[in-house]
Amino acid sequence: MGKIEDKKRQKKAALLSAAYKLFTEKGIDNTSVSEIVKEAKMAKGTFYLYFKDKNEVQDCLIATQANRVFERANLELNNLLVEQHFESVEECVILLVDAVINQLKDNPSLLRFISKNLSWGVFSNMRIVDLDNRHCMDIFDSLLQMSKKKYRQKELMIFMIVELVNATCYNVILNHVPVEIDELKKDLYQTIRSILHQFESVESDKKTAVAC
């Protein structure tokens, strides 16, 4: 059973890899199932053992690729936290966002694919296997819990941050308009701080030092 399951995983991974290559080169609308199986060197019937249609492949790829970006960003943040102490949870959130942006900056094809197709539902339900299968939302939540501040409507707050980053970085990274990404970051991160402050609960003790 182990070998059989391993072969199944390999076939599914090969189909996903082939589809990702074609989707990023041609777009999903211009890619057919026949082209995917040809690229993966498999029979067309094999495709339907794993996926209902190419849209299901797309959803799987979006979740997988975004998952990897977030996983690497979280690992980078954790490494930084081992090396130094940060005074606020806001700085931790910004470091996480910065790690995500830097990955997308280095991989424009990935940015095009994720930004065009990543819905809030997909993002909020993504699970990171290497982090005990936790939701991406759980990672944000764990950062917020490190703070002695309390936040209201945390899901809405995170939604606003994610959508802000997604909307502002796309044209800046891909088309370099209206500014370069390094110039955008300063104002973007200040806006993220403002969002976090806006959602602070009135019960938070403003005089208490915040540790992250």
Enumerate the language-model features and the residues they cover:
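Amphipathic alpha-helical packing segments from all-alpha helical-bundle domains
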Residues: 71, 91, 102-109, 121-148, ...
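Helix-turn-helix
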Residues: 14, 22-56, 60
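Hydrophobic/aromatic-rich alpha-helical bundle segments in the mid-to-C-terminal region
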Residues: 112, 145-191, 199, 203-208
